């Protein structure tokens, strides 16, 4: 099918999905999870083809993003079941107003309609996005990167089998066969056919959507995430958090990319950092972190001299930009200049410094004494997320079910007319 045909088919799925009750949607998600596991062999074979084709062209870290395993497939099915267990967002009354004239006005959550997701080489996004869209009563159109197409196609075939078993339209979940820039542009300009576009990818993709999209678009920005170690930090805690934020999974958007350290503790902290992230990892046979150091940090430990652009780089790799700052205000200013407004953390025992940091850092998630790696729908108790929004309107931070709905006002009356016989009951007359 062409992109236009897929878009038209998705429009036809809007009404059945909008009318589906929670039990129907939950049964569909369970059937999709069962079908996903049943198709494990086919999905893993397809994934191996993707890995074979990508090997030598992308880094080992990016290959890890692309790779599927039986354990990861089990986690994907578990994620779908977790979405099924969440309350149905559709039909929730967000606000109720009873007017003096007897009108009952309810601000009610309703499905978005058709949600398009452009993403790159993370096949697990396929099942996450489909589960969230179905539970939120919307059809979803998926456009993955070419490196992951075989994997995503096999996953979507399984999900559509689950939809058929649950008697919901299989076109509620569709994958574009075209992975070119042209297909992405087609989604960006599909006015009247796409109700919401969510790009999940690198800076180039996000910029293209912001500049070219004529349909509503939510930015799920790149993650230049910062950790600031304050002079009042517990330095052992700080090393633990920095290690986790950088090395637990460096290829994801909530991984730390820049470390800022207060000048008063730099001489004590940097040797601890190097021992843990560089020497200790090398001794354990793990990839050491390449430290890109500003001049003050380089005077204390060895590393790579930091270039100015390093502090604006999302490495998605075992690399970390490091700078020394004078105080918490200097850290806040550095973050304001270089942040992508995703996730930032302060490590401190000083409540005043923590309050200043959380009030002044303008990012979707701001942590005190915790790793930025918690910026995730599941970790927030929202279920799997469609992405992490770095903008301020409609959605900000991990986008769960509530953020995938819009709302309408439903008004119940008993014959009221404006300026008519009931006007004397109203608190407003023209």
Annotated model-derived regions:
Residues 1-105, 132:
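N-terminal Rossmann-like NAD(P)+-binding subdomain of aldehyde/semialdehyde dehydrogenases
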Residues 85, 93-236:
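Rossmann-like NAD(P) dinucleotide-binding subdomain of oxidoreductase/dehydrogenase enzymes
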Residues 22-26, 90, 166-173, 248-255, ...:
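Flexible, glycine/charged-enriched surface loops at secondary-structure junctions
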Residues 328, 333-429:
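C-terminal core of ALDH-fold dehydrogenases
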Residues 13-19, 259-261, 317-326, 341-346:
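Short, well-ordered beta-strand elements within core beta-sheets of diverse protein domains
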Residues 120-139, 158, 162-165, 205-317, ...:
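ALDH superfamily catalytic-core signature
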């Amino acid at each position: 099918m062409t992109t236009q045909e897929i878009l038209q088919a998705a429009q036809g799925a809007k009404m059945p999905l909008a009318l589906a009750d929670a039990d129907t949607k939950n049964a569909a998600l369970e059937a999709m999870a069962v079908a996903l596991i049943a198709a494990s062999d086919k999905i893993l074979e397809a994934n191996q083809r993707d890995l074979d084709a990508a090997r030598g062209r992308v880094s080992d870290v990016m290959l890890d993003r692309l790779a599927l395993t039986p354990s990861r497939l089990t986690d994907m099915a578990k994620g779908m079941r977790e979405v099924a267990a969440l309350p149905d967002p559709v039909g929730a009354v967000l606000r109720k107003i009873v007017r003096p004239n007897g009108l009952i006005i309810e601000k009610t959550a309703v499905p978005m309609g058709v949600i398009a997701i452009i993403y790159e080489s993370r096949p697990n996004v396929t099942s996450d996005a489909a589960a969230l869209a179905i539970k939120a009563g919307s059809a979803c159109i998926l456009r993955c990167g070419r490196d992951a197409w075989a994997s995503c196609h096999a996953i979507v075939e399984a999900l559509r089998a689950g939809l058929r078993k649950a008697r919901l339209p299989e076109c509620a979940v569709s994958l574009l066969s075209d992975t070119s820039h042209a297909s992405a542009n087609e989604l960006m300009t599909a006015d009247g056919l796409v109700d919401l576009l969510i790009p999940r990818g690198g800076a180039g993709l996000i910029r293209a959507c912001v500049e070219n999209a004529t349909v509503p678009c939510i930015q799920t920005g790149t993650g230049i995430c910062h950790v600031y170690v304050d002079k009042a930090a517990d330095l052992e805690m700080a090393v633990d958090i920095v290690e986790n934020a950088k090395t637990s999974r460096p290829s994801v958007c909530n991984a730390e990319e820049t470390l800022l350290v207060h000048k008063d503790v730099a001489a004590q902290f940097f040797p601890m950092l190097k021992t843990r992230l560089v020497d200790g990892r090398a001794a354990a046979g793990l990839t050491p972190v390449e430290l890109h150091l500003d001049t003050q940090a380089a005077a204390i430990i060895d590393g790579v001299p930091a270039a100015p652009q390093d502090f604006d780089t999302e490495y998605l790799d075992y690399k970390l930009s490091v700078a020394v700052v004078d105080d918490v205000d200097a850290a806040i200013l550095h973050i304001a200049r270089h942040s992508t407004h995703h996730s930032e953390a302060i490590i401190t025992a000083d409540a005043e410094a923590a309050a200043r940091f959380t009030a002044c850092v303008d990012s979707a998630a701001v942590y005190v004494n915790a790793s930025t790696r918690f910026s995730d729908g599941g970790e927030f108790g929202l279920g799997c997320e469609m992405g992490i929004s770095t903008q301020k309107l409609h959605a900000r931070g991990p986008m769960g079910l509530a953020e995938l709905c819009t709302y309408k006002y439903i008004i119940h009356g008993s014959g009221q007319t404006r300026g008519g016989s009931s006007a004397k009951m109203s608190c407003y007359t023209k």
